[in-house]
Regions:
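Formylglycine-dependent sulfatase
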Residues: 2-333
């Protein structure tokens, strides 16, 4: 049985083996493999059609699974920051975890390795690794900045400052704190567009893009696809499902928002795939899709999913199957 860390490590080693020293010219590099790693936030394996869900609509990710590899057993940490540190360094948290929202600046990440191998590098989405000092003031600013982790370009939420992540967000864009004030500005779409622009600019050279998504972390919000819907989108069959009896009726729209966020996350993955096709680099680009931990749990802010006739309560934060089992899909034509 292969886990995510072993798989990513083997992919990285295989990719590096195909590369020549960075000092050689682009012509000498020849045919290269681009890599895009997408990691969703708070979506357990049970929220994807390719894992058997009929409740969630994820056609673009399902297609990647159908035409690529779907791993049935992939396990993360039960919380986001430990997972982010682990996947970026390839090390168990017992070896290099410092504290919440801190990535040890002495650690070498896959961004550093890909840049050293001659790749253009980009990251967009959620950072939260510099050290905000919320829980440990003495560690504020003691973590790692994206440029020090090997990324040439970035569009990130929570680098040095917080702010909104969804509607009218505030992001660090290549080191400059930027507010997106247009009423239609939606953070995940901005980050996806940033990655697509990066792909466009680097179509003729090896590139690596890491997309630690903000979707579908709380707060549950409407998306550009669902924002214009009139009234709460409540499925009456779902309200009275036995698995939902512990939830009051006022909470059901939040469940629907989560489902809509999963669908929109899938749409954004599809946008990246379409961009690769558009610029003619899909055939030599490896796409990896995974998650940082299980779906949200708890009596308020938690979700319940149906999978193969079984009700699964979100297990984020727990060292259980529901808290640590995530999707892993690899696709390269």
């Amino acid at each position: 049985m292969i886990n995510r860390r072993s798989f990513i490590k083997s992919v990285g080693a295989g990719t590096a083996a195909m590369l020549v020293p960075p000092g050689l010219t682009q012509a000498a590099i020849g045919k290269h493999t681009n890599v895009i790693l997408i990691m969703s936030d708070d979506t357990g394996y049970e929220t994807f059609g390719c894992y058997g869900s009929e409740q969630y609509k994820t056609p673009r990710i399902d297609e990647l699974a159908k035409t690529g590899l779907r791993f049935n057993h992939c396990y993360s940490q039960p919380l986001c920051c430990p997972s982010r540190v682990k996947i970026m360094t390839g090390k168990s948290n017992v070896r290099n975890y410092v504290y919440w929202d801190v990535l040890d600046p002495e650690e070498k990440t896959f961004g550093n390795m890909m840049k050293d191998a001659g790749y253009a590098t980009c990251i967009a989405g959620k950072w939260q690794l510099y050290g905000e000092g919320t829980f440990a003031p003495e560690l504020a600013g003691k973590g790692t900045l994206p440029m020090d982790a090997g990324f040439d370009e970035h569009c990130l939420w929570r680098v040095k400052e917080g702010g909104e992540r969804y509607w009218q967000p505030q992001f660090s864009v290549n080191g400059t704190m930027t507010s997106f004030d247009d009423e239609d500005a939606f953070g995940p779409k901005i980050c996806t567009d940033f990655i697509c622009d990066f792909i466009e600019k680097n179509r003729d050279k090896p590139f690596f893009a890491y997309y630690p998504m903000m979707l579908t972390h709380v707060p549950f919000v409407t998306t550009p696809e669902s924002r214009e819907a009139s009234g709460p989108k409540i499925c009456t069959d779902f309200i009275f499902h036995p698995a939902m009896r512990w939830l009051d009726e006022a909470f059901i729209p939040e469940q629907q928002k989560f489902e809509d966020m999963v669908t929109y996350m899938d749409t954004l993955v599809g946008q990246i795939v379409d961009k690769l096709e558009e610029v003619g680099v899909r055939e030599n680009t490896l796409i990896l899709f995974t998650g940082d931990n299980g779906s949200p749990g708890g009596s308020k802010g938690g979700v319940v999913s149906e999978l193969n006739g079984i009700s699964i309560e979100g297990g984020k934060g727990k060292t259980t199957d529901a808290g640590t089992r995530v999707a892993l899909v690899a696709n390269m034509p």
